[in-house]
């Protein structure tokens, strides 16, 4: 054994061993408890970033720990390989997306292997391979036959830069999630999957996901947006045979309606606009602004009075109809009743356009609110509401709805914010949608014997226009002798990531989408790890697809994953200087020299050219701020184990992690000191068996702390998933071991036990150094201690070692603490009293007076009551 830790010498050696022995390749074993641990698969962008490293390290720690519990652990890896960036890169580099993607996968796979992740590479998946996407094409045709897929022309979110449709979830603050371009509205034919048919299941089953973060479940509940209300029909004044239907969750405010607002794309808006040029212009302006429901609360409220009126369903009063930019056709009916006295948005609109504002709800104290100053949002008893005056919120809702139903002008209604999933993308680099339009106009799914519909992989892309649209030879096909035209749109790439976890159970199965026996063995995923930014896109589609596969008879479980961990972002210092044109030029932290005071506080920074830099603080690692850190360079400098240890120690997994190279250096020092400690122990030769019954008090205390640490680390990793506190506990134990005596054979035997346990506990975090140190600690392996730590089991707590022989008792005189003494556990009052009287501080404060009363709390406290008179 060499005396100095050199990560370069050991990590590649250990990784070769894992590759050659296929250590982490698994198969179904009904005799063993399974554990499926999965990180969200990456897009092969070409380089790993530190966010990837953190995600995959967390997952690997969990997987290795569960393996040491004796479970059959599956931890696969693959590539979410379709996507728009490949097209942009292909244009820039004058290559095909497939060649660019393959090269990226090859490089990133080497990066992952260099970090020592325990993947079963025999199950590797790549979503752009026909053998993968053929099954989602097949599944899509099955859903079409079941009526869960349909095509319609609809207004969609259109990215003018990427020339493609965006799902609602992919529009953030009115801009494309990918390129930040301002999103427009456009009417084009689209394919949809009926996720709304599963809205109740998706909502209700969230309650069964006990081990998912509440934040994710709350976000999904809000996105699904189930609400109970009433649909109310307001007849048009000029044509009482025609109604405007409004959906409301606040029927108690019906008597306060001041206006009806309809969406710019409502059918009535379009009808009126034919004869009102100003309205037509307004509608056109609104068409180019995609807005999520959440944004309606913050935008400037704009509208146009149509000059038409609706009739109040209970009073017959005429109510003006407005077209407003804050009403969304996608939610409810595309028409809302404006109650400015009791809704903030309606109040802002009414105030701007000088519409009447009426209070119909009383304050809690029974007085009438001044709704001219601000709306009363809270619920309460009704006023100015005729026969409903004085009723409570629930009473008024029930009575008003009942009356509307009796009059035939309303009905109870459950509504959802969730909209069907538009899966068409006008891009080339995606899985072709397997639909065909025949000569007779019928649309059918591609027959199974013609699947997969293969993308022409070597296509060179000259611009962002989809080349499939122009490839007439590819689009032409025939079915049963009838000519047809293929669909030239491709799938939203969220399709591929919605079922990959199930395919990992049977990656080479060629008789169907899923081999049910294998899927039912491995599923559901026991631990899923990924960022919370996926809460309402991937994680919702992921759950939806699982239910679709269940109903297709492919899997038996209700949900895809039992437990979800959302790791925090990785932050790094960001520095910039202002260029002559006023633009900020961001400088990589690796090129910055920082000066700090003796307390470590930032003083100033400058780059290699001596320019003074402005410190923008810690921010998410990103290309835009040039503050990303290349994992490969860090691994080469410090080693994979150091990077892994730092990543897990620097922060709790769900919290943000602040990247500091000083933290890496600290982790590196710890591993070097650990190596040297084991070296010094090993070179002294083999140890004798530990005689637990003959340990002295010092040895007992050390062994007790060892097994307390095992108990804590076990709980921290397995239940609490606070990996940073687990590492802190191991480090604290090592500090005790560094100071421990090594004079006797029993001292060394105890050090041997401690080293073995520490190496086992560190193995999930730092597998390479643990692998080598384990071999040096076991010159003669046996069944209890196998040759390779990969085959060893997690250390078991010796409950007998935790038994305390001694305890610390507080000594008080007249309630004031005067001393602390160590006595044998369960000592009697007399024994503790006699020991206390020997303490110098007790003698000093008693001043020769004999206590008149003694109070004893066994193993904790002795209070001597003294009469000082």
UniProtKB/Swiss-Prot annotation:
CDD domains: Anticodon_Ia_Leu_BEm, LeuRS_core. It is an enzyme of class 6 (ligase). PROSITE patterns: AA_TRNA_LIGASE_I (PS00178). It is found in: Cytoplasm. A motif ('KMSKS' region) lies at residues 620-624. A motif ('HIGH' region) lies at residues 42-52. ATP binds at residue 623. This is Leucine--tRNA ligase. Its EC number is 6.1.1.4. Keywords: Aminoacyl-tRNA synthetase, ATP-binding, Cytoplasm, Ligase, Nucleotide-binding, Protein biosynthesis. GO terms for biological process: leucyl-tRNA aminoacylation. InterPro entries: aa-tRNA-synth_I_CS, aa-tRNA-synth_Ia, Leu-tRNA-ligase, Leu_tRNA-synth_edit, M/V/L/I-tRNA-synth_anticd-bd, Methionyl/Leucyl_tRNA_Synth, Rossmann-like_a/b/a_fold, tRNAsynth_Ia_anticodon-bd. It comes from Hamiltonella defensa subsp. Acyrthosiphon pisum (strain 5AT). Belongs to the class-I aminoacyl-tRNA synthetase family. One of its GO terms (molecular function) is aminoacyl-tRNA deacylase activity. GO terms for cellular component: cytosol. NCBIfam families: leuS_bact. The keyword Cytoplasm applies. It catalyses: tRNA(Leu) + L-leucine + ATP = L-leucyl-tRNA(Leu) + AMP + diphosphate.
């Amino acid at each position: 054994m060499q005396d100095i830790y050199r990560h370069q010498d050991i990590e590649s050696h250990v990784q070769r061993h894992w590759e050659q022995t296929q250590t982490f390749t698994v198969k179904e074993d009904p005799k063993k408890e399974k554990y499926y641990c999965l990180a969200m698969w990456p897009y092969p962008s070409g380089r790993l970033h530190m966010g990837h490293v953190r995600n995959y390290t967390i997952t690997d720690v969990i997987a290795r720990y569960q393996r040491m519990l004796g479970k059959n652990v599956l931890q696969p890896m693959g590539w979410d390989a379709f996507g728009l960036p490949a097209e942009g890169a292909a244009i820039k580099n004058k290559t095909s997306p497939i060649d660019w993607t393959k090269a990226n996968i090859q490089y990133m796979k080497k990066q992952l292997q260099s970090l020592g992740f325990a993947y079963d590479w025999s199950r590797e998946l790549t979503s752009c391979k026909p053998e993968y996407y053929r099954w989602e094409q097949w599944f899509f045709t099955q859903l079409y036959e079941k009526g869960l897929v349909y095509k319609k022309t609809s207004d969609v979110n259109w990215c003018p830069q990427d020339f493609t449709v965006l799902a609602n979830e992919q529009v953030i603050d009115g801009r494309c999630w990918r390129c930040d371009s301002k999103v427009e509205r456009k009417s084009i034919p689209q394919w949809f999957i009926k996720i709304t048919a599963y809205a109740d299941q998706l909502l209700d089953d969230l309650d069964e996901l006990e081990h998912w973060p509440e934040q994710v479940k709350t976000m999904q509940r809000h996105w699904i947006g189930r609400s109970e209300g009433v649909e109310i029909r307001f007849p048009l004044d000029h044509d009482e045979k025609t109604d405007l239907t409004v959906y409301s969750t606040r029927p108690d405010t019906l008597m306060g309606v001041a206006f009806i607002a309809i969406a710019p794309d409502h059918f009535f808006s379009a009808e009126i606009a034919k004869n009102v040029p100003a309205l037509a212009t307004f509608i056109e302006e609104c068409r180019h602004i995609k807005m999520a429901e959440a944004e309606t609360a913050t935008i400037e409220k704009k509208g146009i009075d149509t000059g038409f009126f609706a009739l109040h369903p209970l009073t017959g009063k005429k109510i003006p109809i407005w077209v407003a930019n804050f009403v969304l056709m996608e939610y409810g009916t595309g028409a809302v009743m404006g109650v400015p006295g009791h809704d903030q948005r309606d109040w802002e609109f009414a105030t701007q356009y000088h519409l009447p504002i009426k209070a119909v709800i009383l304050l809690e104290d029974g007085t009438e609110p001044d709704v001219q100053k601000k709306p009363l949002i809270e619920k309460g008893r009704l006023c100015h509401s005729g026969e409903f005056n004085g009723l409570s919120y629930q009473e008024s809702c029930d009575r008003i709805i009942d009356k509307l139903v009796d009059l035939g002008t309303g009905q109870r209604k459950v509504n959802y914010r969730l909209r069907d999933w538009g899966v068409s993308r006008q891009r080339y680099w995606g899985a072709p949608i397997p639909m065909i339009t025949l000569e007779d106009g019928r649309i059918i799914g591609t027959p199974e014997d013609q699947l997969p519909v293969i993308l022409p992989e070597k296509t060179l892309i000259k611009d962002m226009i989809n080349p499939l649209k122009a490839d007439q030879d590819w689009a032409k096909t025939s079915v049963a002798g009838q000519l047809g035209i293929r669909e030239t749109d491709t799938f939203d790439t969220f399709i591929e990531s919605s079922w990959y976890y199930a395919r990992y159970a049977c990656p080479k199965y060629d008789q169907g989408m899923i081999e049910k026996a294998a899927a039912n063995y491995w599923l559901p995923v026991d631990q899923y790890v990924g960022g919370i930014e996926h809460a309402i896109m991937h994680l919702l589609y992921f759950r939806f697809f699982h239910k679709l596969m269940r109903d297709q008879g492919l899997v038996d479980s209700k949900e895809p994953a039992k437990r979800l961990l959302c790791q925090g972002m990785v932050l790094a210092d960001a520095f910039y200087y202002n260029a002559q044109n006023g633009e900020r030029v961001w400088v990589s932290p690796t090129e910055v020299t920082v000066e700090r005071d003796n307390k470590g506080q930032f003083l100033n920074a400058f780059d290699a050219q001596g320019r003074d830099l402005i410190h923008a603080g810690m921010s998410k690692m990103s290309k835009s701020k040039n503050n990303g850190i290349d994992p490969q360079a860090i691994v080469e400098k410090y080693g994979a184990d150091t990077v892994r240890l730092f990543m897990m120690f620097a922060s709790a997994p769900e919290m943000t992690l602040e990247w500091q190279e000083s933290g890496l250096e600290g982790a590196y020092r710890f591993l070097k000191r650990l190596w040297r400690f084991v070296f010094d122990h090993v070179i002294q030769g083999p140890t004798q068996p530990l005689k637990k019954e003959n340990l002295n008090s010092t040895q007992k205390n050390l062994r007790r702390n060892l097994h307390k640490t095992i108990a804590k680390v076990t709980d921290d990793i397995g239940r609490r998933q606070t990996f940073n506190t687990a590492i802190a506990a191991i480090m604290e134990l090592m500090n005790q071991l560094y100071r421990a005596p090594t004079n006797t054979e029993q001292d060394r035997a105890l050090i041997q036990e401690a080293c073995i346990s520490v190496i086992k506990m560190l193995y999930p975090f730092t597998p390479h150094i643990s692998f080598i140190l384990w071999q040096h600690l076991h010159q003669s392996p046996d069944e209890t201690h196998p040759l390779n730590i990969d085959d060893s089991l997690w250390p078991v707590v010796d409950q007998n070692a935790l038994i305390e022989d001694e305890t610390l008792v507080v000594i008080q005189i007249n309630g004031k603490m005067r001393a602390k003494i160590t006595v044998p556990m369960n000592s009697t009052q007399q024994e503790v009293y006699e020991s206390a009287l020997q303490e110098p501080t007790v003698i000093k404060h008693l001043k020769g007076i004999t206590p008149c009363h003694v109070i004893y709390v066994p193993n904790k406290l002795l209070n001597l009551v003294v009469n000082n008179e």
